[in-house]
């Protein structure tokens, strides 16, 4: 889950000091996966924990690479825990702004995550130089403003080998709008760049025609495609399996 974890998880229970919080002291947010807590990406012990997990996968298993999704981030409401407040105050000589979307406050936190991702990439390459370091964030404006993920800078700093941008939209015009962005074109010139297409959820199946239309749009922009996710592509579908399979032949 990146920095996101279930509140009852072992890591959250054993290391309450690793959790960050909102201004009101609350430590949870509600998302598609229910209620979650967030590990503090600015805390050195959290960074070490994540790094060790990633290096274990890289060295102990025959993995071609590793991918970090939109949860390798932090919702911008968070960062008001004691450790982060002290760090920000030490570096800037002032307390964090009450406005969690204050541009300087957003940039400071985003820069810290960027620095960690650069360090993590270097750690992976040190033990497995040809491992693919893949990232799968949301489209840039949302990722940066709401999740402190400055993934365009990650690409510019050579901290990513592959980019798969999640564009989970049912409206084709809105979907295409996210493809036709300068940051997508810039990334595409530097590393393999693709688009994540939503193929459905258990309670929200997606018609194959919508998937086909989006794939065609992506191909027109010369981008790659990844589907989220395997089971919904074939099993939780409004059409018979044979029909969906036939659309890929």
Label for each model-derived stretch:
Residues 45, 49-195, 220-222:
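Active-site neighborhood of glycoside hydrolase catalytic domains
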Residues 159-175, 182-249:
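Substrate-binding cleft of secreted/luminal carbohydrate-active enzymes
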Residues 20, 40, 107-110, 156, ...:
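Intrinsic disorder/low-complexity segments enriched in polar/charged and small flexible residues
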Residues 25, 29-32, 38, 95, ...:
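Amphipathic, alpha-helical segments enriched in basic
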Residues 11-12, 84-91, 241-248:
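Generic hydrophobic, helix-prone segments enriched in Leu/Val/Ile
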Residues 2-60:
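Active-site-adjacent "subsite" loops/lids of carbohydrate-active enzymes
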Residues 3-6, 72, 140, 169, ...:
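Conserved beta-strand edge residues that scaffold enzyme active sites
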Residues 6-12, 75-78, 143-145, 172-176, ...:
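Extracytoplasmic/secreted cell-surface and envelope-processing proteins
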